[in-house]
Amino acid sequence: MADFVGSWKLEHSENMDGVWKALGVPSDMVDKARNEKPEFTFELEGNKMTIKMVSSLKTKTTTFTFGEEFKDETFDNRTVMSTVTKDSENKITQVQKGPEHTTHIVREVTGDKMVITITVGDVKAVNTLRKM
């Protein structure tokens, strides 16, 4: 899990528009978010992880215990119930359950690169982050 710890910057995004559309995110919010290059900080303390995302649109901090469901707020202000599990030392999976959609977010670290795969139904987006 130590590979996650540190600061990361979005380098490339593929098909986030498709995921946002599948989630019903308002088009004005999509237009604002489309060109953002947020920075992320991952911290780990025992079985708890904190993920902080900073962009010009929003700063969001999420702290969770692996394997325990928690109330979460998405970037577009939807309330969901999330559970994050450790798949391996360099891979975690988050499942967000909302009233209308279930979103799967897989984060996997290889070296100085993190690939985040977001799936809503049959729509998939891939974000690539680079360690700073």
UniProtKB/Swiss-Prot annotation:
Instruction: Show the CDD domains listed in the entry.
Output: FABP
The alphabetized UniProt keywords are: Acetylation, Lipid-binding, Transport
GO molecular function annotation: lipid binding
* Intrachain S-S bonds: none
Q: Which residues carry this modification: N-acetylalanine?
A: A2
Keyword Transmembrane (UniProt):
no
- From which domain of life does this come? Eukaryota
Give yes or no: UniProt keyword Transport: yes
**Family per similarity comment:** Belongs to the calycin superfamily. Fatty-acid binding protein (FABP) family.
Q: What is this protein called?
A: Fatty acid-binding protein type 2
Q: Which organism is it from?
A: Fasciola hepatica
